[in-house]
Regions:
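Divalent metal-coordination and catalytic microenvironments
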Residues: 62, 83, 101, 114, ...
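Active-site-adjacent substrate-binding region
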Residues: 248-283, 337, 341-398
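Acidic/histidine-rich catalytic neighborhood of metal-dependent amide-processing enzymes
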Residues: 146-219
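Acidic/His- and Gly-rich active-site-bordering loop/insert found
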Residues: 30, 34-140, 149, 164-165
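His/Asp/Glu-rich mid-to-C-terminal helical/loop segments that flank catalytic regions of hydrolases
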Residues: 237-249, 253, 257, 322, ...
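Midchain, well-structured core segments that form catalytic/ion-binding scaffolds
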Residues: 197-325, 334-344
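Sec/Tat-exported extracytoplasmic proteins
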Residues: 59, 63-66, 70, 87, ...
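Bacterial Sec-dependent N-terminal signal peptides
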Residues: 1-24
Length: 439
C-alpha cells in the first residue's frame, strides 16, 4: 500500500467498539446454517482449516526474509514452488519477479484473477514478532506477507475443489507495489494479451478488527495528487509562507469541525468509515506544510493533496492560479501542475454488490462491514488493473486489541493477527467459486 501517514500512531484500541468483535461472533453463528446448505463451501471451510498452519508458517518465512521492490527473487522462488506443488501451471516471464499461477477448473467458463502483492518496505522499525526480519533495514511492515499467504491459501483450497470450478483462476503475485510500478509494468508488458481476464480481485490488510471485511463500490481512497508551483525567484520567505497559507486555506473542504487528516479516526464508530455520517467523505486538504526549494534560479512549492470528488480535481489548478492573480503575484507565477497523479482504486459497482451479496449469504450479514468513506494518505497500484478489468479491492482487518496486536501499516510495532489469513482464504475462495458460476 503506497504512502502512509504516521498520524495513525495516535489511534487507540478504545475506538474499536465491541460491535466489531460481536459481529465476528454473529458471523460465526450464521455461518453453519448457510454453509451446510452448500457442500462446496463446507469443503472450502474444511480445507482452509487444514491448510491454515501451513500458511502461517510460510507467512512467517516471508516475514523473516523480506525483499524490497524489484528484488523479490527468493520470494518469487518460494511462491513458484508452492504453486507447482499444487499442480498449477506457473509462469514467471511476464515482468520482473512476478508469478502467475493458473488453475483450470473441470468446466469451461470465465477467467478470474486474484492479485497478491509481494514486496517489503525499507525501514527498521521495532518489530514485536518473535520471527523478526533477518534483513537489516527491510521489513514486511505493510502486510504483504499476509497477502501472499492468503493468495497461496486460496490457490490450495481451490485446487482441492477443482471439480466445482467453472472456468479458470489466475493467481497474480505482483512485485513492486510499494513503488507503484509493478501492476503498470505487468500490463505494459502484455499480461492481458496472454491472459484475457473477465474480473480481478485483491485485498489489503488494515488496522480494523481481525476478520472484518470492508468494501464499497467506487473509490476506496481519496484522489492523491502532488501539486508543484513554479515561480520566478525573488519572493521572500515571508511572501512564500503567506502564499502557501492562502493556497492551503483555499484547498480545504470538510464537514464542520471535522479533521479527515486524523486517520486514526477511521475506526471510530461515531465518525469512522462504518458510520454513514463519517468525516471521511466530501473533503479536500493538503498534507501538512508545502515543501519549498530553489533550483536553477527558480522557486518551487510542492505538497500532496487529497480530494474525494473526482469532478473537483480539474478545478484545483485554476483555483491556485487565481490565488496568484488575486494576490498580485501573477507575473511571478511560471506554472502550476500535478507532478504525481497515480490512479486511485475504484471498485466496479456491479461486482462489488455481487461480492457483498455472496459473502453475506454464505457467512452472515456481518461478514462484510459497510464503508461510507474514502481513506486519505493510502493508495494501491491495483488501480492500474481496474483501469483495464472490472475488479474489486477489499480491506481485511488484522488487529486484535485484546491481544495487543495492532495492524497499523508502515508504522513501528506493526503486527497482524494471523487469523486474518483464515478469514481471507475462506471468504475469498468462496467468492471466486461463486463468481465463476455467475455472469
Amino acid at each position: 500500500m503506497k504512502r502512509f501517514s504516521l498520524t495513525l500512531l495516535c489511534f487507540a484500541s478504545s475506538l474499536f467498539s465491541a460491535q466489531g468483535l460481536n459481529s465476528q461472533k454473529e458471523t460465526g453463528t450464521n455461518l453453519s446454517k448457510n454453509i451446510n446448505e452448500q457442500p462446496v463451501h463446507q469443503s472450502v471451510q474444511l480445507e482452509t482449516d487444514k491448510v491454515f498452519n501451513k500458511l502461517v508458517n510460510i507467512r512467517r518465512i516471508f516475514h523473516e526474509n523480506p525483499e524490497l521492490a524489484g528484488k523479490e527473487k527468493q520470494t518469487q522462488e518460494k511462491i513458484k514452488q508452492y504453486l507447482l506443488d499444487l499442480g498449477l501451471e506457473v509462469q514467471t516471464d511476464h515482468y520482473g519477479y512476478s508469478v502467475v499461477g493458473i488453475l483450470k477448473g473441470d468446466k469451461k467458463g470465465k477467467k478470474i484473477a486474484w492479485r497478491s502483492d509481494m514486496d517489503a518496505l525499507p525501514n527498521d522499525y521495532p518489530d514485536p514478532e518473535v520471527f523478526k526480519s533477518k534483513v537489516k533495514g527491510v521489513q514486511h511492515g505493510c502486510g504483504h506477507d499476509i497477502h501472499m499467504a492468503i493468495g497461496l491459501g486460496i490457490a490450495e483450497v481451490l485446487s482441492k475443489n477443482r471439480k466445482s470450478l467453472k472456468g479458470t483462476v489466475y493467481f497474480i503475485f505482483q512485485p513492486e507495489e510499494e513503488s507503484f510500478k509493478g501492476a503498470k509494468e505487468l500490463l505494459n508488458n502484455g499480461l492481458l494479451s496472454k491472459i484475457n481476464l473477465d474480473e480481478i480481485y485483491g485485498l489489503h490488510v488494515t488496522a480494523t478488527p481481525v476478520g472484518q471485511i470492508m468494501v464499497k463500490p467506487s473509490e476506496m481512497f481519496a484522489y492523491q495528487k502532488k501539486i508543484r508551483i513554479q515561480l520566478k525567484k525573488g519572493l521572500s520567505e515571508e511572501e512564500l509562507n503567506g502564499l502557501t497559507k492562502k493556497i492551503s486555506n483555499s484547498l480545504f473542504r470538510a464537514s464542520s469541525g471535522s479533521k479527515p487528516w486524523e486517520i486514526q479516526s477511521i475506526v471510530d464508530p461515531k465518525i469512522g468509515l462504518t458510520n454513514p455520517d463519517t468525516i471521511f467523505k466530501d473533503y479536500l486538504f493538503t498534507d501538512g506544510k508545502f515543501n519549498t526549494y530553489s533550483k536553477n534560479n527558480e522557486s518551487f512549492l510542492e505538497a500532496y493533496l487529497y480530494e474525494t470528488n473526482s469532478s473537483n480535481v480539474d478545478k484545483i489548478i485554476p483555483e491556485v492560479q487565481k490565488i496568484f492573480e488575486d494576490s498580485g503575484y501573477k507575473n511571478q507565477l511560471l506554472s502550476v501542475s500535478f507532478v504525481q497523479e497515480n490512479p486511485t482504486v475504484i471498485n466496479n459497482e456491479k461486482l462489488t454488490k455481487s461480492a457483498i451479496e455472496i459473502l453475506q449469504n454464505l457467512y452472515g450479514k456481518n461478514a462484510v462491514a459497510s464503508d461510507y468513506g474514502q481513506v486519505p494518505f493510502f493508495n494501491d497500484d491495483f488501480a492500474y488493473f481496474q483501469q483495464k478489468i472490472p475488479g474489486v479491492y477489499f480491506f481485511l482487518g488484522g488487529s486484535n486489541f485484546e491481544k495487543g496486536v495492532i495492524a497499523m501499516n508502515h508504522s513501528p510495532n506493526f503486527q497482524v493477527d494471523e487469523e486474518s489469513i483464515r478469514t481471507g482464504v475462506k471468504s475469498f475462495s468462496s467468492l471466486l467459486i461463486e463468481r465463476l458460476n455467475r455472469n
